[in-house]
Amino acid sequence: MFSLPNCFARSVACLLLVLSPLVCHAEAGVSANRILLGQSAAFSGPAAQLGIDLNAGARLYFDQVNRQGGIHGRKIEIITADDKYEPALTVENTRRLIQNDQVFALFGYVGTPTSNAALPVFTSARVPFFAPFTGALSLREPFNRQIFHIRAGYVEETEHLVDQLARVGIRNIAAFHQNDAYGQAGLDGVQRALRKRNMTLADSATVERNSNNVSQAAQRLLTKRPDAIIQISTYAASAALIKQMRAAGYTGQFHNVSFVGSQPLAQALGPDGQGVGVSQVVPFPWKASNPVVAEYARALKNDGKGEPNFSSLEGYIAAKVFAEGLRRAGADLTREKFIAALETITLKNYDIGFPVEFSPTRHTGSTFVDMTVITKNEKFLN
């Protein structure tokens, strides 16, 4: 006997069977017209300028892409969450971004302790973790398929710094480092570079994360009077130490790794900044002959987004490489296809003026390190 309800039920069942592949293949954070990214970073507190600048550079590039219709018809959006450079907040933000906001990928996290804290969360969820603003070995070894770096590691940066000092005969070197995973990662790199040259660290002193209380560190280092101090901290604490030691008559050299935040450091130091060194992991932002730098400078000018700086250039490059991965992944976007697409980027098939190369067994995209020195009026010499 014909039954309308039964017929309707069978029709619905058939429809679900037809649609089920589409439902099953829908990826989190991906819709017909949007790709959603999540970024937890310091947007307030002593390290805020790092998150602000990195995000500004990324948005500068993504806005260009979106004005041109996006990638495969999808525009890129970033949800930001302020973690104040605190690991516990980063974990909360990461869980919310993945579980509640359903982001496609995590982008531009700032810091070693914060990224380390998020590591088990995004790894278990198998969410891509792209371009963290850190050079720590803990996020590079052992290999993690979800993580992609576009910056050199602290091993490369500190090797470059120690090499530059050793070449000019400076062997009495001390370290000032943040008392956490970031500081330890940088300190390990310094000691590794010194051992390579049969040198030993003259002394070290610490500062707590998100603190500018450097009085004890300054006193300790002043007693040893090293010829040079390598700093592994953020701009506020590094500037505080330099100012206190200069005021006490210290005339040795100060050198920082790129994470310090170059422009905020120069601004915080004022006249005391002259001669302070900073290693860099992106090209000089005022080098007009470099293709990606020239493109970045034009975008800043066209959008009226202020002056160039190292951190926003890093965000711009990160966004550009991320977008290249999306293009290569194709219109049927999934996280797995995105990861596989990024792994096809090589120096031979992707030349933007900054060396980036991935493979299925190597997700550290660059080992590029350069040196800069702060000059008068908070400018930089390359």
Where are the predicted features?
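Loop/turn elements at helix/coil->beta-strand transitions in domains of secreted/extracellular proteins
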Residues: 33-35, 73-76, 100-105, 124-128, ...
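Periplasmic-binding protein-like
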Residues: 97-110, 130-132, 174-177, 225-234, ...
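Beta-alpha junction/loop-to-helix N-cap segments that form part of ligand/metal-binding clefts
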Residues: 30, 34-36, 49-56, 64, ...
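Short, low-complexity disordered leader/linker segments with a strong preference
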Residues: 1-36
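Extracellular/periplasmic Venus flytrap/periplasmic-binding protein
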Residues: 92, 136-138, 145-249, 284-294, ...
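Short, solvent-exposed amphipathic alpha-helices that sit
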Residues: 50-67, 89, 129, 157-160, ...
